[in-house]
Amino acid sequence: MAVKMFRDCGSEIFNTGTSKCPFVPDYIKAIILTPVGMTFKISDYDTKLGEYAHADRPNRVYPISTIAEYATSGGEAQTSATGYGSSKITGYSELVETYTMNDYDEGLRTNLMKLKNESMRVIFIDKNNVVYGEKTDTEGDFRGYELGAVYPGGQRFKSSGENASLTINLVYEDVEKAWMNAISFTSDIDILDEAKGLVWVDVKKLATGENKYKVVEHYGGFDLTEMYGTLLGASSVWNNVTAATYNPDDGTLSLTPSSGTPALKRPSELYAEDVKGIEQWS
């Protein structure tokens, strides 16, 4: 381990030129929450994002989309003066960024409440498939900006002038570090198509019909069976099942149990079978 024998000014070494082709960030359309310890390769992040979103915990990322509005507060210089001396910058105030979802979602709001005691990082994707994050000490790697807190907000019910809305508030752990180590790169593919989080689902056995089942959203009960159709009608996506069939006439699944109760496989296994975006409630 190298030890510095002399002190230098470090970050106070700077230049003030501007790019010959200035880059202007565009509208943020998706945010990706990641565990604090996760880093990613810039070279293949876009092609692996879907895999990361379906990975087994604790190596999973949590995409949230679609974002429709953005606002910010804080992140301003704080100053202090001693005696009759001039004011000096002592630091920067807490930065809170607020992202408004295009649509209200009760299930997402509920899940975000569970992050009260969690430490996370965040990566952003804009409308032009530009990815924003933070540099690491390893060339070619990046990670998300570190957050002190993540919490939901917005208007839960419709009023005379506004529809229900959901906001996601991101509180930065260290705004100086985030801004000074920022990095961005552009994907050649439509990475926003992969920026989809998972939805909790329940597997419900119907009272009518032998071994007839439905797959419905845990929050709200929306029936997903017909949407996934034959993808769920394969025994390879199920545990404790010897045979599976999708019935298009009534939008049900016929599952033949082997032992125990039929259950969907882990999201990482479902992803390999092209079943994306769902995880069975547990």
Question: Can you annotate each of these PLM segments?
Answer:
Residues L206-E226:
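Beta-strand-rich structural segments
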Residues S187-N211:
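Beta-strand-rich domain onsets/edges
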Residues I42-A164, E173-D190, T208:
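Extracellular/virion structural assembly segments
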Residues F40, D105-T110, D126-K135, G220-T225, ...:
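Short, surface-exposed beta-strand/loop "edge" segments at domain boundaries and coil↔beta transitions
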Residues M227-S282:
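The feature marks long extracellular or luminal low-complexity segments
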Residues I168:
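Nucleotide and nucleotide-moiety/phosphate-recognizing core
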Residues V131-E134, G144, F222-T225, V237-T245:
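Surface-exposed loop/edge segments in extracytoplasmic proteins
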Residues M1-Y62:
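Polar/acidic, low-complexity leader/linker segments enriched in S/T/G and N/D
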